[in-house]
Amino acid sequence: METQALKDFFLHDEFARQNGIELIEIEKGYARTQVRIEPRHLNAGGFVQGGVLFTLADLAFAAATNSHGTLTVTSTANITFVRGANSGIITAQAQELVNHHHLPFCEVRVTDDSGNLLAIFTASGYRKEGIYAIVENNG
């Protein structure tokens, strides 16, 4: 599957785009996303709102599991927040641990720009047989 075609596919994730979340890197079973923290991302306590971290991790999960070409949707997701952040660039790195033909499983580590772990996100998906994330141009 072409990397640029996959990145283009995820440009249609309007929610992530509206929140400043970008897909930086994608390979088979792996993806990296980032967001530069702005005042709009902070909660009343002055820390990055948990929903921002969840969305960042969820996009990384989606990219990693869809990297094989078959449309994959999230079936379950869990996030554990371990540290707060209030500035800088936050990165989520997703690694597919189980590449099952219907039920993939992935771990996503969310870190700040100093490498501090902020959250761990795990999710399983469901691959929609016969539905493809992108259509390759064969000439």
Model region roles, listed by residue range:
Residues 1-139:
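Terminal targeting signals and extreme-terminal segments of soluble enzymes
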